[in-house]
Amino acid sequence: MTFIYIENMDSHLLNKNMIEGQIKPIGGMQKNILQAFSSVNRDDFVPQNLKDNCYSEKNLFLKRDRFVLKANLIAKIISALNISNEENVLVIGSSTGYSSAIISRLAETVISIEEDQELLD
């Protein structure tokens, strides 16, 4: 897969391209998961130094052994969980909160726990 970097492209379009190029090709992805990803811009959940590449198909390393998983892996995990809108979800080690934000569009309640304050700032 080839990605072309375009300066000043807005987050919504980058997010849409990520969904089309990385998540939809997985096949069988539930519509509600695609909608959840559409409503959360990945660049809102990464530090400034990672924003330029945050929509690429790779994990985003934050520090030490902490990172934000690549979007297609998050989508596979969330799909396997088969979360309903009546469920409460606990996310332990939520990092920057990106996956929690997506899950919040699917579940009744999401509680995120992160011990590293730097990742939340």
Where are these regions (language model features)?
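Conserved SAM-binding loop and adjacent beta-strand
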Residues: 27-28, 43-50, 60-78, 82-83
